[in-house]
Amino acid sequence: MSAFIVLGAQWGDEGKGKMTDYLAENADVVVRFQGGNNAGHTVVVGEKEYKLHLIPSGILYNDKLNVIGNGVVLDPKALFEEINYLESLGVEITPDRLIISDRAHVIMPYHRILDGIKERARGNKDIGTTGKGIGPSYTDKMERSGIRVCDLIHKEVFEENLKETLEVKNKIITEVFGGEALDYNEIYNEYLGYAEKLRPFVKDISVIVNKKIKDGKEVLFEGAQGTLLDIDYGTYPYVTSSSTIAGGVCIGAGVGPTAITNAVGIAKAYTTRVGKGPFPTELLDRTGDWVREKGHEFGVTTGRARRCGWLDLVILKTSARISGLTSFAVTKIDTLAGLDTLKVCTGYRLNGEIIDYVPASLEDLAKCKPIYEEFQGWDDSIANARCYKDLPENAIKYLKKIEDFTETKVSIVSVGPKRDQTMMISEI
């Protein structure tokens, strides 16, 4: 394997950061290909905990090249705050270890302002945005009015683009939403400062990444969010603004589809989601509360409590199909220890029919009634398990059901947040 993808197979928060960190040990390059600082990854190394939002998880190794791809929308302020945070924890970040695509689009102050204003204007029909300016930045990208990193570091180009764009944005902010206009000079001077700090990191990442692949280097593509937050295949409109599935790698990192050899879907042993939208297996009872507390299900970026539910195999089967997954990595199976009975969803009942896929219509998904298969749980903690045979028989049966239903093998099992609480049970 020379180029493989790690992506979320549910609604995000599956443990991609930990899995990327684990798999990055044998990689030469780690590439982030979409999203922005709305993502949150937690990685535990020894006694230290690192919270990452923009920078690839490979940064915690000294010998990896980390890449922020053109599919990412970059908030320079957030980037340098994260760099300062990591350096305060002893992580060295230099242009030899981190490069940023010259084609990545830049999140500007008006993107954050518009994100918040529009969300408030939706009232009780809000979509649960993080308010980081991600959606408005991707909107400008599609409308061909965005500012890219290569534009930002060219002073004259940036000056002209900012003048044109800010004039339009201020009209929208003031005349449509009744907000206060943003000051051109303030933004211009602030972002010129970012431009100079960014300049040493900026490269044509497609050229570099493809050369690494051609030279036989191990390249890991790190996704953010999850399959059901994908702009096309997610539970629209309660989705993110980028392509979170395997196909997003080609666009977001400038590589061809034939370069990808493997795709690993990260899945919790149960299901969670943040914000609004249908959730067929949601547990609105004491069991759901118990899972939330035991699994520490609160967002890294927002701090919001996550909604919790039984494992939904329909979602995993859909993710495997859409992204061509070669295997799953199952996380947080240790959280389920102590439950007498476990349920997994093996189908939906919709309008009198049984289906095994996620329907496009939000209204149809809201009507779907889960069909469950029950499994006996296990009492003992499995946090100290270090190989497959250490797992309880019932946990192995649970994992086998995932494989059989999705027709996709489970290659990795995680039983805790630390690096050594991870077992590779087959090739990915």
From Swiss-Prot:
Taxonomically, the superkingdom here is: Bacteria
Pathway(s) the chain acts in: Purine metabolism; AMP biosynthesis via de novo pathway; AMP from IMP: step 1/2
Quote the record's cofactor note: Binds 1 Mg(2+) ion per subunit.
Keywords from the UniProt entry:
Cytoplasm, GTP-binding, Ligase, Magnesium, Metal-binding, Nucleotide-binding, Purine biosynthesis
Q: Where are the active-site residues found?
A: D13 (proton acceptor), H41 (proton donor)
Q: Where does substrate bind?
A: V300, T301, T302, G303, R304, A305, R306
Q: Which GO terms describe its cellular component?
A: cytoplasm
For this chain, the family text in UniProt reads:
Belongs to the adenylosuccinate synthetase family.
What is the name of the protein in this document?
Answer: Adenylosuccinate synthetase
Q: List, in alphabetical order, the Gene Ontology terms for molecular function in this entry.
A: adenylosuccinate synthase activity; GTP binding; magnesium ion binding
Residues annotated as binding GTP:
12-18, 40-42, 306, 332-334, 414-416
Q: How does it assemble?
A: Homodimer.
- SMART domains to which the protein is assigned, alphabetical: Adenylsucc_synt
